[in-house]
């Protein structure tokens, strides 16, 4: 066997230069071949790529290279999600301009990505912070504005008085801003929103068509959209207990069948009725203020202790006006959900039960499980939310839940309060319109002007883009655009009078909600898309990214595609045909005696008995080996891709990232695993060189017949070809790599046999070597190019078409059949695939297991189901 070592440091830059020179990854929009668009979620230019990037982009590259080899016109672009808060933080902390910081990071990360050997069309590269990109985003905003998909509305928002910006609910922790630590205020503010709720039902229904998306992602979106059918019920308020002017309280419920179990009403702290009550009661006012300080993220509200205060207001039961229900202000009701008010039926809702137990309001069960005695059915600490029959509900008693819901709806639809029905059937959605206003500098400017005379005036198309000024100062907190002395002051486009630009910028999720469409023709200077091109190249056939983007990014992109269709920018509804969410890259953590984390590069690990011992390389101090966690800077358990690529080569890193775990699961980083991948690279190199020496003696023409040895080599090669391709098509990359290893093992055995191979075997070895190189090319393209050249093949393997599978070679010569005696399995038998019935019968009856099962009884008949099963009847 050859002892020559493969030198990745020399090979990889050489082949990358050849690919660039030949422009083999550039995609032509007019290419007549069937298109295939593969896209990994583009990165934020933080400054360095991490191993998660390596895994993500390697997966996409395997798909791109495979589909290119199979004759598709592959679009595989790359760009930069370049706006965002970290650039402003860098400007504040390091006194560097956001633009300069961003583009320096892009240059560094691009260089890193290029060392990975990714088959990207860099000619289509753009950054979302470039005015040539956001010019078109501003144009689409104005188009959305014209058709009512963008609006300005007043919302109650979380305001950080130190950072002077609006915070999302998830950014408020224990009532304080996640970054500044300041107590967050609730402020009513003007906010630009996209009307995503207009498409709520369509976005929900279309999830059924996305059969190449993970079920968990579709479920997350389904829950986020949150469609519920129910009843809007208007409760009259007792005039004697209610502030002047308040006459009714509206609630939306999906369980109108439980109305007779109502024990309290709960309203949000910012509900108008709560505000009216607080104006006349200091205790209520104090409770409302305390609620404003709490976190507003749904997860935090769900886990917080349920608290409330009785307003003294009483609501009247819609079926019995003598039945008064106390109205509480509660910390678990949000104004933005439903009507900002609920009725509590504690017997059948755990949250409500916890609440009434705390305030001793009691509970009355109104749904009894089938078979349970209604008289003895009680609720104490655990609510019952199952099916059953109605009890303690007057005219509903004995009904099923479904029938009771219908009966309540019918009665309340015909009852009136004032001049309107008490009840109204409604479909409610949890989904809320998308607020896009951000009080930040480093984002896409919103292209509107505010005039005291004309109001909100769109920036004329001819004046786009509205470009961010570069001479900004971050000496003051808040939005640098607000402080700019000249940028925001402009004449009104309509009346010419004094006016001001909108100083809010767009949520960065807007930038990433249409970038996939821009990649189809990023050279179009006059429009966001070129209709015939975008409609031909979209949807993205395979999108790859983290599950953390399952809701917001993916849902916003689905909305944006519909909005772009409504405004004439493209002609389809769904942006991504296939979606794949890869797992994370995880690593052990290491902690010193003083509690500080140590990086893997600072730690030495040795085996000790049945375990392992870790020490610091510098000084030998013992280190605690901690749990395996996601790689993060805070835990210092990251591995620098540059170090791995510099030591082992990009192909080794790529192979390891694909081989160790199913791609949708986390991969545990292991230095031993990387070394194993490196050894396999060297083994393949030696193997191909050995095969190349044999191939030089092979006949040019295909032999007319093949002997057993040659046939075995060919069967293994074509079997691997079939299995590896199947794995890639299913994105089961680890399975494909296992089949490559399996084939390499059998091929290595064939190469190791002594003596000069026969002409037919030499021909088969040459064919198998070519197939082997093409099989690992998508995963290890640099090694594949070097091996391709060693085999004397013309051109580049990156341009070669996938080998044709000879299906007749996939048929096994023998087949294994299960054998039953009187319907009970007794064993298996392996026979020639073309064996006739008589031969199979004879072989079966000769089996010891069959003779023992018959125990001397005569054979009545033998039933042979061809290539399926044999049953002996005795």
From Swiss-Prot:
Catalytic activity: tRNA(Leu) + L-leucine + ATP = L-leucyl-tRNA(Leu) + AMP + diphosphate
One biological process term in Gene Ontology: leucyl-tRNA aminoacylation
Record InterPro entries: aa-tRNA-synth_I_CS (IPR001412), aa-tRNA-synth_Ia (IPR002300), Leu-tRNA-ligase (IPR002302), Leu_tRNA-synth_edit (IPR025709), M/V/L/I-tRNA-synth_anticd-bd (IPR013155), Methionyl/Leucyl_tRNA_Synth (IPR015413), Rossmann-like_a/b/a_fold (IPR014729), tRNAsynth_Ia_anticodon-bd (IPR009080)
Entry annotated with the keyword Nucleotide-binding: yes
SUPFAM superfamilies to which the protein is assigned, alphabetical: Anticodon-binding domain of a subclass of class I aminoacyl-tRNA synthetases, Nucleotidylyl transferase, ValRS/IleRS/LeuRS editing domain
Pfam families for the chain: Anticodon_1 (PF08264), tRNA-synt_1 (PF00133), tRNA-synt_1_2 (PF13603), tRNA-synt_1g (PF09334)
Extent of the signal sequence: none
PROSITE patterns (UniProt xref): AA_TRNA_LIGASE_I
Entry similarity comment: Belongs to the class-I aminoacyl-tRNA synthetase family.
Protein name: Leucine--tRNA ligase
Gene: leuS
